[in-house]
Amino acid sequence: QNYKQAIINARDRSNVVTGRSTGHPVRCLRNKLTARFEELETSGASVEDIEKLGTGRLRAAVVDGDIEWGSLMAGQSSALIHDVRPAAEILQNMFAEAADVITRLPRFES
C-alpha cells in the first residue's frame, strides 16, 4: 500500500534514473535509496558496490512497503496517476474512450 501511495503522490519531477553506470538503468521514484545510488555513481564506486546496494530493494518496496530504502520502480507517467483502481475498470475506460474517438474520426471515402 505504501508503494501505491508513493506513486499517487508522485509529481513530474519525482523520478530519477539510477544504475546507468552498471549498464542496468532503472527509473524510480526519488528516495533515500536513489540518493545513495547517485552518490555512489558520481563518486566512481565499483559496479559491484552499486549492484550490492540494489540487491533485494524491489522486494523491500513491494513486499515490505519500505518507501525510503526500497526500489520504487515507476516511469515518467506515474505523475498522471491519481488513484488506485482495478485493472478491469481502467481497461473498460480505455476501450470506451477509444470507441468514442473512433466514432468522431472523419470518414474517408475511397
Predicted regions located by residue number:
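Conserved active-site-proximal phosphate/metal-binding subdomains
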Residues: 1-110
